[in-house]
Amino acid sequence: MNAEKPPVAHNVDLEEIAKFEAVASRWWDTEGEFKPLHRINPLRLGYIAERAGGLFGKKVLDVGCGGGILSESMAREGANVTGLDMGAEPLAVARLHALESGVELNYVQQTVEEHAAQHAGAYDVVTCMEMLEHVPDPRSVVQACAQLVKPGGHVFFSTLNRNAKSWLMAVVGAEYVLRMVPKGTHDAKKFIRPSELLGWVDETPLEERHIIGLHYNPLTNRFKLAPGVDVNYMLHTQAKKPV
């Protein structure tokens, strides 16, 4: 697991990084602040693996990997995984957990734009989960992800829709009522409508393949993937192949 020095970063919100650095030591606590990520990880992993035609032997980049929950699970599926993040503390936690778990993967402290400049067309699969709403310029991230994937490769995004229901459920409900995540985790003004995300995708060689909602039922305390993208949603895109 190699470490690379972080570059001079531009598309970075230092306040957002600081929020996650402060709780990084508890990233792998399945009952702590990141419990929802642990709960939804099997759903995300299953969706990505199914839509990408399996992960075994594929070169995968996890953008905004944090403490490595998804990165490590994809590596366990046989993928050659690189996790990318700008948070030093989450990456330190990710590296330590991988070492203790005996999972081989690489973590890099670098912006996705910098990584794209060095590794264009290098990956079979690129994932960008719950990251777009935490950067100043999400459009730039989408463009970089498109540059990183091989022709015919797959890029997955997940984020939160911007509307009253999403604010009520993801901010008021999740942060203040149910206390599923720390207060201040989300800024509803930074949420992204599917039409906006698809507009950015249309500016790249990526094509939409599938979109699905991630739903939480507080009565059953269960998550599921189902139609309806009014709160959380996942988007599967694929890079065009040369004609």
UniProtKB/Swiss-Prot annotation:
Alphabetized UniProt keyword annotations: Methyltransferase, S-adenosyl-L-methionine, Transferase, Ubiquinone biosynthesis
Ubl conjugation found in the keyword field: no
EC number of the protein: 2.1.1.222, 2.1.1.64
Source organism of the structure: Cronobacter sakazakii (strain ATCC BAA-894) (Enterobacter sakazakii)
GO molecular-function terms, A-Z: 2-polyprenyl-6-hydroxyphenol methylase activity; 3-demethylubiquinol 3-O-methyltransferase activity; polyprenyldihydroxybenzoate methyltransferase activity
Taxonomic classification: Bacteria, Pseudomonadati, Pseudomonadota, Gammaproteobacteria, Enterobacterales
Binding residue positions for S-adenosyl-L-methionine: 44, 64, 85, 129
Catalysed reaction, written as an equation: a 3-demethylubiquinol + S-adenosyl-L-methionine = a ubiquinol + S-adenosyl-L-homocysteine + H(+); a 3-(all-trans-polyprenyl)benzene-1,2-diol + S-adenosyl-L-methionine = a 2-methoxy-6-(all-trans-polyprenyl)phenol + S-adenosyl-L-homocysteine + H(+)
Known pathway: Cofactor biosynthesis; ubiquinone biosynthesis
Transmembrane found in the keyword field: no
Classification via SUPFAM superfamilies: S-adenosyl-L-methionine-dependent methyltransferases
Family: Belongs to the methyltransferase superfamily. UbiG/COQ3 family.
Protein name: Ubiquinone biosynthesis O-methyltransferase
